[in-house]
Amino acid sequence: MKPNIHPAYRTVVFHDTSANEYFKVGSTIKTEREIELEGVTYPYVTIEVSSKSHPYYTGKQKTFDNEGSAARFQKRFGNFIGAKRG
């Protein structure tokens, strides 16, 4: 590998603002912000959605019992398609 062409890999703190959770993850993301966590200063990045706040992972997912668009089309216009012209 060529020296000095790869981004610096380091531990970064990601802050899920909607769940107010902090994650320490190895990353090459560039950021100017820093945060002190557990007595150590880390690069800091805010995110809006993570596994702690996304409905799929939290189990608070909304389910919709709507029929699909193809079924709605058949319901509205099914008679026109099958009707004989004449």
UniProtKB/Swiss-Prot annotation:
Subunit and partners: Part of the 50S ribosomal subunit.
* Family label: Belongs to the bacterial ribosomal protein bL31 family. Type B subfamily.
The record, for InterPro entries, names:
Ribosomal_bL28/bL31-like_sf (IPR034704), Ribosomal_bL31 (IPR002150), Ribosomal_bL31_B (IPR027493), Ribosomal_bL31_sf (IPR042105)
Any one GO biological process: translation
Q: Which GO terms describe its molecular function?
A: structural constituent of ribosome
The source organism is Citrobacter koseri (strain ATCC BAA-895 / CDC 4225-83 / SGSC4696)
Phylogenetic classification of the source organism: Bacteria, Pseudomonadati, Pseudomonadota, Gammaproteobacteria, Enterobacterales
Q: Does the keyword Ribosomal protein apply?
A: yes
Gene Ontology cellular component list: ribonucleoprotein complex; ribosome
Provide this UniProt record's keywords sorted from A to Z. Ribonucleoprotein, Ribosomal protein
Q: What protein name is recorded for this chain?
A: Large ribosomal subunit protein bL31B
Q: Which Gene3D superfamilies match?
A: Ribosomal protein L31 (4.10.830.30)
Which SUPFAM superfamilies would you find in this protein's record?
A: L28p-like
Instruction: Report the NCBIfam families cross-referenced here.
Output: L31 (TIGR00105), PRK01678.1 (NF002462)
